A protein has these predicted regions:
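Short, low-complexity N-terminal intrinsically disordered segments enriched in polar/charged residues
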Residues: 1-30
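Short hydrophobic/aromatic-rich beta-strand segments that constitute the beta-sheet cores
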Residues: 38, 84, 108-109
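Short beta-strand edge/turn micro-motifs at domain boundaries
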Residues: 94-119
């Protein structure tokens, strides 16, 4: 693994750790560059403040116990790009994110997930 790939993997793992250890939104967005972009189906978030707002809403919308059931299925790194797939039990059988890392920070991220319909 080259140096850039190592940095990329480290940044993404730190980001996931902040989320999974429930360190709070401030710790989660600390991994982002000030001018980062976060792309979701609903909209593009610009900068740490808007990205933080996304995470407040996202964490609040998760099913009870979701963070404890989070499973990282795939982590692939190629230079400054990282791709992950993940799941949260049967409620969210597939989530995916792609990260672009620059100067040790997330500069761009895509996010998508499929949540099973509530029965």
């Amino acid at each position: 693994m080259n140096t850039q790939s190592s940095v990329t993997e480290s940044v993404v793992r730190n980001h996931l750790q902040a989320f999974l250890e429930q360190k709070g939104v401030a710790a989660i967005v600390d991994d982002y560059d000030e001018t980062a972009r976060f792309h979701s189906e609903a909209r593009t978030y610009h900068g740490k403040q808007e990205i933080g707002g996304f995470f407040v809403d996202f964490i609040g919308s998760l099913p009870a116990g979701a963070i404890e059931r989070f499973a990282l299925r795939t982590l692939r790194v190629d230079g400054s790009i990282a791709y992950i797939t993940w799941s949260v039990g049967s409620e969210i059988p597939l989530g995916t994110d792609t990260f672009v890392i620059g100067n040790g920070k997330i500069v761009s991220q895509t996010f998508a997930m499929y949540a099973a319909p509530v029965q």
